[in-house]
């Protein structure tokens, strides 16, 4: 029962109306018997610092950070984990003993979760998009030992910055979505991962669209695994299209749960819940 002593954890982003995190996190908090609730708070770019400073002064125990704040929030944190610092992208914060924000990134572990048993070592992959989520995905693909990682984006400046971020750790190929070479890569890819918001179910985005338009996908073959980080709607228009082509498809739900478990552990100093607790809550809701 919520009381005057109840603390909260919040999801900060814009938009957040589509988020399923409150469903699964509140199920987990109830499972653990903690006097905590999880809420979603819409936050515009210009309000981010004000919101984070305000939350320091009330019963906030931690935050999830989502689009479009994963990179900007770096400057507002006093402690940053090695993985978050490397990726320059943050999705989880907690208040430390000095009432300052400590930050980490649980997206890499979440992203890998559905791929662990698919034997993708030495395979070819494409990442669509060049924002904060793409950084986590690329790190995950490096961890899985894929041989080729190509990044396709419509934003040249963020694409160049993304490739620079990984330096000499792996040879990344960057292309604009209008480049003819993209069709060759799509035809040969073993795995394609969408990190763009195209297809997300919100008032801000149309959910019946595909990343870069349907003609961009004309060379997709049935042997390719298509992984869309979007989890609402599930399946997305992209995954429906890919399934009709005969592709194996993966939506963002397993990643959402897996990263959520790691975030919860970060907020609670090591407590964990079984995967099924969050997953069952989502399935019941959906």
From Swiss-Prot:
It catalyses: shikimate + NADP(+) = 3-dehydroshikimate + NADPH + H(+). It holds the Pfam family Shikimate_DH. Shikimate binds at residues 19-21, 66, 91, 107, 231. The keyword Calcium does not apply. The active site is at residue 70. HAMAP family: Shikimate_DH_AroE (MF_00222). One of its GO terms (biological process) is chorismate biosynthetic process. NADP(+) binds at residues 129-133, 229, 252. It is an enzyme of class 1 (oxidoreductase). Its EC number is 1.1.1.25. Keywords: Amino-acid biosynthesis, Aromatic amino acid biosynthesis, NADP, Oxidoreductase. PANTHER family: BIFUNCTIONAL 3-DEHYDROQUINATE DEHYDRATASE_SHIKIMATE DEHYDROGENASE, CHLOROPLASTIC, SHIKIMATE DEHYDROGENASE. Pathway: Metabolic intermediate biosynthesis; chorismate biosynthesis; chorismate from D-erythrose 4-phosphate and phosphoenolpyruvate: step 4/7. It comes from the Bacteria. The gene is aroE. GO terms for cellular component: cytosol. GO terms for molecular function: NADP binding; shikimate 3-dehydrogenase (NADP+) activity. Belongs to the shikimate dehydrogenase family. Involved in the biosynthesis of the chorismate, which leads to the biosynthesis of aromatic amino acids. Catalyzes the reversible NADPH linked reduction of 3-dehydroshikimate (DHSA) to yield shikimate (SA). InterPro entries: Aminoacid_DH-like_N_sf (IPR046346), NAD(P)-bd_dom_sf (IPR036291), SDH_C (IPR041121), Shikimate_DH (IPR011342), Shikimate_DH-bd_N (IPR013708), Shikimate_DH_fam (IPR022893), Shikm_DH/Glu-tRNA_Rdtase (IPR006151). Homodimer. This is Shikimate dehydrogenase (NADP(+)). It comes from Prochlorococcus marinus (strain AS9601).
